[in-house]
Amino acid sequence: MPVPGITVETILRDHDDLQLQLVTGEVGLSNRINSAEINRPGLSLTGFFDFFANDRIQILGKGEWAYLNSLSEEKLGEITDKFFEFHLNCIIYTHGNEPQVPFVERAKEKGIPLFKTEIATHRFITLISQILDRALAPRTMRHGVLIEVFGIGTLLTGRSGVGKSETALELIERGHRLVADDMVEIRRLSESYLIGSCSDLLRHHMEIRGLGILNIKDLFGVGSVRDHKLIELIINLKEWEEQTSGDYERTGIEQSMEEILGVSVPYIEIPVKPGRNIPIIVETAAMNQRLRKMGKNSAKEFSNKLNTYIQQSSIETNPIKD
């Protein structure tokens, strides 16, 4: 996987909602942004540059703009020179404020993109932070099929040829939705959430042995696909092995987990052999996961009932005598 990153040019080109207007520094549009954090350089503009986060996007709001306007020409030039001694990826003025002339001159000289936007500072920071969080999120690739089953993002894994795509195709025919086939791109958007998606090239397509490449959106309609989905369940399809059949889960009391990018996801292993209806088992697993999220564990409830029954039977069989 390539190292997550985004260029200034990509932000300018793909996100019209930011209302960015390039003032100068177009030669630096190829600068890469590698931090999702935003910096408001208020303290640095007073001359204190210790711990200056120059690797972040620099946002100058009303406060910074008003402070720079209050400085004498000599002091403004001094602060500007110190500020532009650092390598900066880009600078953005909010509220439609016009950048000070020394800032424009230095940005042009250093090749640092300088923007302004009509959006208020707080709103702008919220918007661009969401963009950076998505673009710079830790990510990995997994071989499998990601499908939404009863609202649960279900990642089907298993060795090649075990029947992942065929199972997913049957689920799609039943009304569930495809997210990604073959290679699933997984991003961690927070400490506990994983989002799965597909590359632009493979999106909405599946490979079925004997049929080739299928466009699921064209075959089953727009309601049969979606671009991304929260991963809430991993189901590993594994060929049935008689010698290890006793190792398969029989009660479901304990929930197995698999870790991806530091996030633990519920994990189920389903043995595959002729005669087993795997799609309906996957549907049932997804519905059961929804129940678990709601705090209802059928296996534990049954275990509690069984323990109560055994205790009552023991008392009836061996009554306590005075």
Swiss-Prot record:
One of its GO terms (molecular function) is phosphorelay sensor kinase activity. Mg(2+) binds at S165, E207. Its EC number is 2.7.11.-, 2.7.4.-. It is an enzyme of class 2 (transferase). It holds the Pfam family Hpr_kinase_N. InterPro entries: HPr(Ser)_kin/Pase, Hpr_kin/Pase_C, Hpr_kin/Pase_Hpr_N, P-loop_NTPase, Ser_kin/Pase_Hpr-like_N_sf. Coiled coil: none annotated. Residues 271-276 are annotated as: Important for the catalytic mechanism of dephosphorylation. The active site is at H143, K164, D182 (proton acceptor), R250. Homohexamer. Catalyzes the ATP- as well as the pyrophosphate-dependent phosphorylation of a specific serine residue in HPr, a phosphocarrier protein of the phosphoenolpyruvate-dependent sugar phosphotransferase system (PTS). HprK/P also catalyzes the pyrophosphate-producing, inorganic phosphate-dependent dephosphorylation (phosphorolysis) of seryl-phosphorylated HPr (P-Ser-HPr). PANTHER family: HPR KINASE_PHOSPHORYLASE, PROTEIN YJDM-RELATED. This is HPr kinase/phosphorylase. It comes from Leptospira biflexa serovar Patoc (strain Patoc 1 / ATCC 23582 / Paris).
